[in-house]
């Protein structure tokens, strides 16, 4: 029986050694992903305020980097315009496990960024130039730059790609189509019926009057 016991010890040792090696590899990978020693935001939790030039002067927009991957960097474009990056915080449970470096970003007019009151700044082409300035400030290039846009962010992402496709490695669009009439039809026929009828009635009341800044409309 002794030889069998010896074989068991050897087998156990081999399994333990393999398991230890795998753990070491994963730990090393995680260390690289979390290494911010060469980043200029290393003492700021990944946060960077980026100055943006506009026809109405210079303003600052908020960004936050998570992770470190020189070959895959994703800039997240939120909806709105006027929404915030929080919609994407669920990505914290997915992207780090895949080693993806990603950037939260509040567009001009959103919560953590400057909020100028000049409505002429709410222009698609101007937002495209803003994204390009953010890209340059973050050091993203066509070797690693992926743009993710949802809803309004999808429109912005597509418009950016039409002008600056040479700067992109990839474009991901969520919950948006490249046609405003088609999206309006989808909104009227699919999204609107899911709302509470009374809420929808109020929304339509303010939209018919084009009273988009009404406090009640904003609450809805």
Where are these regions (language model features)?
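C-terminal motif of bacterial Sec signal peptides marking the signal peptidase cleavage site
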Residues: 16-17
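A short loop-to-beta-strand scaffold at the N-terminal edge of the catalytic core in hydrolase folds
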Residues: 56-65
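Short beta-strand element of the alpha/beta-hydrolase
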Residues: 71-80
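The serine-hydrolase catalytic nucleophile loop
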Residues: 82-93
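Conserved alpha/beta-hydrolase
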Residues: 95-114
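Conserved acidic catalytic loop of the alpha/beta-hydrolase fold
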Residues: 125-144
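Conserved hydrolase catalytic core segment
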Residues: 142-186
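A catalytic-pocket lid/entrance helix-loop region that shapes and gates access to the active site
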Residues: 170-213
